[in-house]
Curated annotation (Swiss-Prot):
UniProt-listed InterPro entries: Ribosomal_bL27 (IPR001684), Ribosomal_bL27_CS (IPR018261)
Name used for this protein in its record: Large ribosomal subunit protein bL27
Keyword Glycosyltransferase set for record: no
UniProt keyword terms in alphabetical order: Ribonucleoprotein, Ribosomal protein
Taxonomic source organism: Deinococcus geothermalis (strain DSM 11300 / CIP 105573 / AG-3a)
Entry keyword Ribosomal protein: yes
Family per similarity comment: Belongs to the bacterial ribosomal protein bL27 family.
Amino acid sequence: MAHKKGVGSSKNGRDSNPKYLGVKKFGGEAVVAGNILVRQRGTKFKPGANVGMGRDHTLFALVDGKVVFTNRGAKGRFISVEAAAPQVAAD
């Protein structure tokens, strides 16, 4: 007969850190080159004009401008950046 009480172990009791995914810059917002537009797993959104994609599928602006979302049906949802007109210094 055992004189110690058997102590069970739990297979639960852990949690992962939050990943902070999602859209970071919405349609119409002004962005500068390098701004992160979307953090995602897989290609929920695809890069359009003036948008690059990192190796973790993060979309980021390649130029200064305004964010534009477009839905191309079966091809998917695309994010583009409309380049801002270059500022010309007045002499």
